[in-house]
UniProtKB/Swiss-Prot annotation:
Keyword Repeat attached: yes
Physiological role: GTPase that plays an essential role in the late steps of ribosome biogenesis.
Keywords: GTP-binding, Nucleotide-binding, Repeat, Ribosome biogenesis
Ligand binding (GTP 2): 226-233, 273-277, 338-341
Binding site for GTP 1: 9-16, 56-60, 118-121
Top-level taxon: Bacteria
Transmembrane segments: none
Name this polypeptide is given: GTPase Der
InterPro entries reported for this sequence: G_ENGA, GTP-bd, GTPase_Der, KH_dom-like, KH_dom-like_a/b, P-loop_NTPase, Small_GTP-bd
Similarity field: Belongs to the TRAFAC class TrmE-Era-EngA-EngB-Septin-like GTPase superfamily. EngA (Der) GTPase family.
A Gene Ontology biological process term: ribosome biogenesis
NCBIfam families linked to this entry: GTPase_EngA, small_GTP
């Protein structure tokens, strides 16, 4: 489960600055949702290899008279839903009564809390932060969020208790890598023929061992998400009611989301219901509970996401924010336009026109027009779900991807950089769900965004990938194991192949 980190504290202690630093706001989901306080923000972050959801709760005016009276209801909910609370204080302003009030509340909730003294730049941090130990919440982390100082160390401390051991192992590994890097580079440039199918088959076999875990589970997890009152509950119950094969309701690890196993045409599915606890029979719920946390975690845990939109309300900015999070998470996508029944022909054409205009950047996703209430079109969703999952997990080979790469380069040559043309050598699979294609070459980091989009679209069309995003990664040189834990050389690959042949022969003789 993706951990949740909540930022709490008085106004103007730097919560929003830290939030923007963690989420790199321009690239992350940052949105205000209905029912939340005005300055409450959610985002996805990846710091030091740790994926997590971060919440900015806005300013809390805690007083000695009672913190709960001054806290907004949604801020309380954020603290309850968080795995870790980062309690920000202002190192320059010192300890204030409001800080003490907030600390008292956090101690009562027995939440894992880290006191974070911000704005330590340009001052003697140790002398200014000493008084914050009075809060009784343990060690005080010292950062300067505006400059980014101490932020990475803070996240490692919070999310990786084994950070010291891991860093030690990484340091040893880096030392070893430095010693062998030159030899590996020479071997991959001289000893491996990327146009030889026997050589690339060896490579595929080794790479497949690293990527096989991501597609081992054949159970397709479907998350039904969307804004309040778009019909998520009705759609969930329509799917379950039609099939009548629900085994049991099993609470998932994601807070309050329900993981519901079901089977259809021999395929196992798990429906991730973010609309709250619901038993069969209770189909008509007046209001669907909406939790941003539940929705974001459901997206992370799903294989395929059904983004449900109300045809009568059209596409909102919140829909686009959720869509951005789905794409960032690399999840397969099916667009479901609900409440299609009863609309006039002219209104339907207007809705389709708006979809084409506002969703032109995800032309790879299937769009279904349904009525969850009456059931029309619901059964067809599973064809698109299976198609998207199959595309996201389809296996490809190095020889196939390299052929496609060379075809793309022949049709539209890479640009010149300082008088030299970027050379694209070969491509190999880098992972599944979503499909990852790793392209090796010289000066690939200098390729323009436009050419990268061209390559992505070319691979998508050539591989006929529908319903799933596709990720292209670029790597200098020839070594496909650069940066990986299990590094192999061409000779090691060939030795492994000979060993496997010997083992098979021995078994056959017995």
């Amino acid at each position: 489960m993706t951990p949740v980190v909540a930022l709490v504290g008085r106004p103007n202690v730097g919560k929003s600055t830290l939030f923007n630093r963690l989420t790199r706001t321009r690239d992350a989901l940052v949105a205000d949702f209905p029912g939340l306080t005005r300055d409450r923000k959610y985002g996805h972050a990846n710091i030091a290899g740790h994926d997590f959801i971060v919440i900015d709760t806005g300013g809390i005016d805690g007083t000695e008279e009672g913190i709960e009276e001054k806290m907004a209801e949604q801020s309380l909910l954020a603290i309850e839903e968080a795995d870790v609370v980062l309690f920000l204080v202002d190192a320059r302003a010192g300890l204030l009564p409001a800080d003490i009030g907030i600390a008292q509340y956090l101690r009562q909730r027995e939440k894992t809390t880290v006191v974070v003294a911000n704005k330590t730049d340009g001052i003697d941090a140790d002398s200014h932060c000493g008084e914050f130990y009075q809060l009784g919440l343990g060690e005080v982390a010292k950062i300067a969020a505006a400059q980014g100082r101490g932020v990475t160390q803070l996240i490692e401390q919070v999310l990786s208790p084994l950070a010291t051991a891991l860093n030690s192992e990484q340091a040893d590994e880096n030392e070893e890598n430095l010693a062998t890097e030159t030899n590996e580079f020479d071997e991959w440039n001289q000893d491996f023929d990327f146009n030889n199918e026997e050589d690339t088959a060896l490579l595929d076999e080794a790479l497949d061992e690293e990527n096989s875990e991501s597609i081992a589970d054949k159970n397709i997890k479907i998350a039904i998400i969307g804004r309040p009152n778009v019909g998520k509950s009705t759609l969930t119950n329509r799917i379950l009611g039609e099939e009548r094969v629900v085994v049991y309701d099993m609470p998932g690890t994601t807070r309050d989301s329900i993981y519901i196993p079901m089977e259809r045409d021999g395929q196992e599915y798990t429906i991730i219901d973010t609309a709250g606890v619901r038993k069969r029979g209770k189909i008509n719920l007046a209001v669907e509970k909406f939790s941003v946390i539940k929705t974001l975690q459901a997206i992370q845990d799903a294989n395929v996401v059904l983004l449900t939109i109300d045809a009568r309300e059209g596409i909102s900015d919140q829909d686009l924010s959720l869509l951005g999070f789905i794409l960032n998470a690399g999840r397969s996508l099916v667009i479901v336009v609900n409440k299609w029944d009863g609309l006039s022909y002219d209104i339907k054409e207007q809705v389709k026109s708006e979809l084409d205009r506002r969703l032109d950047f995800i032309d790879f996703a299937r769009v279904h027009f349904i009525s969850a209430l009456h059931g029309s079109g619901v059964g067809n969703l599973f064809d698109s779900v299976k198609e998207a999952y199959a595309c996201a997990t389809q296996k490809t080979s190095t020889s196939m991807l390299t052929r496609i790469l060379h075809m793309a380069a022949d049709e539209h040559q890479p640009p010149l950089v300082n008088g030299r043309r970027v050379k694209l050598k070969y491509a190999h699979p880098g992972g599944y769900n979503p499909p990852i294609i790793v392209i090796h070459g010289n000066q690939v980091e200098k390729l323009s965004d436009a050419y990268k989009r061209y390559l992505s679209n070319y691979f998508r069309k050539s591989l006929k990938i529908i319903g799933s995003p596709i990720r292209i990664q670029f790597q200098e040189g020839n070594n496909p194991f650069a940066g990986k834990k299990n590094k192999l050389t061409p000779n090691q690959l060939r030795k492994r192949k000979r060993l496997m042949k010997f083992i098979k022969k021995t078994k056959n003789k017995k």
